[in-house]
Amino acid sequence: MAVFKKKKTSLTSLFLGCYKAKNASKYEGGEKAVMKIRTCPAFKRLSLSDISDPSSPMSVMDDLSHSFTSQKLRLFTLSELRVITHNFSRSNMLGEGGFGPVYKGFIDDKVKPGIEAQPVAVKALDLHGHQGHREWLAEILFLGQLSNKHLVKLIGFCCEEEQRVLVYEYMPRGSLENQLFRRNSLAMAWGIRMKIALGAAKGLAFLHEAEKPVIYRDFKTSNILLDSDYNAKLSDFGLAKDGPEGEHTHVTTRVMGTQGYAAPEYIMTGHLTTMNDVYSFGVVLLELITGKRSMDNTRTRREQSLVEWARPMLRDQRKLERIIDPRLANQHKTEAAQVAASLAYKCLSQHPKYRPTMCEVVKVLESIQEVDIRKHDGNNNKEGKKFVDINKFRHHRKGKRRVNIAYSDSLVYKESKAKQNDGI
């Protein structure tokens, strides 16, 4: 875990006049609803660097209690979470990721007075895993302040002794990973796959276009959650980073992420930009098109890396038909598949300056959806909306010289519990 220096400046000065503070007394056993924001046009989103001592739980709790947000985050006690999850019963377990196990639970006003009755997902930190207090705090700082229909909603959190827990809205269809790769599951229709791709793209575009940009850094199928209507929402912001501001072109950081999804220039140099997320999106789009995992050691050596094997075939119509998920049969429209494949090809460019922005990605996917809807309704009017041509977007970003730096502490993070080929 990173070591942080304690800052002397209080957060109070950042929010003077913007918040109505409540009494910040003892936290054990009692609810501490985090502050509501008053009308404050100069509101600045908090970052990890704004916390006076990120490594100290009590300092963090004190800073949070004086700071945000309009979303009314709830502080849960460990005893309340035991009630919600039936004592963290294995029968309630939904899955397990890099942060730790996730349980299904239910909350109502008997547990928390005034709270809406609803199912929830409770994610508890694995004290022996790869992640810890910093990732828990990052999750609160990002999802506690950012609100969008394509980001999973954070309801509250728990911080008692070494325990770190997060409480989210429950997503009935689970992760895209499970829906796409689980054995014996029904094949997802082409239209559903493109709907999910569009929703996830809108989530990334929202982060990248924020006044203070956010780089998600760990975009993959297991972090895309689906509601009952297959609306996609991004989850797990433990590895997210604030993007470069002003004249800065990138953020330099230790390489983190998941094998098979991180952009090559990020792995090579540790230079992080929004283009890393665009590359990761291209990997997921390729998985949606082919129905294959990004990395699979059970495949032939030539095909183990999906990107290396499939990308060269994305621009050849005859070869493209060979790599499209055979479970789709004739569901997909040839032209729509070609547009999606061309988009994936662009996102997976080795040079970041040739990748589209996420806003451009959204425009292409929206055109696919609109044309598909029109054809489904029997409206084949040639004067109607056409596919957006990704090749016509101008490369307005300045090219950057690639610097080959081998970071001695670089690490491509792998999930603590190997998920590949285990039937999940």
Curated annotation (Swiss-Prot):
Q: Gene encoding this polypeptide?
A: PBL12
Induction summary: Induced in roots by exposure to air, abscisic acid (ABA) and salt treatment.
What are the protein's GO molecular function terms? Answer: ATP binding; kinase activity; protein serine kinase activity; protein serine/threonine kinase activity
Instruction: Return the similarity comment.
Output: Belongs to the protein kinase superfamily. Ser/Thr protein kinase family.
* Designated name of the protein: Probable serine/threonine-protein kinase PBL12
Transmembrane region(s): none
Organism encoding this protein:
Arabidopsis thaliana (Mouse-ear cress)
Q: Fetch the Gene3D superfamilies from UniProt.
A: Phosphorylase Kinase, domain 1, Transferase(Phosphotransferase) domain 1
**Function, in words:** May play a role in the signal transduction pathway of osmotic stress. May be involved in plant defense signaling.
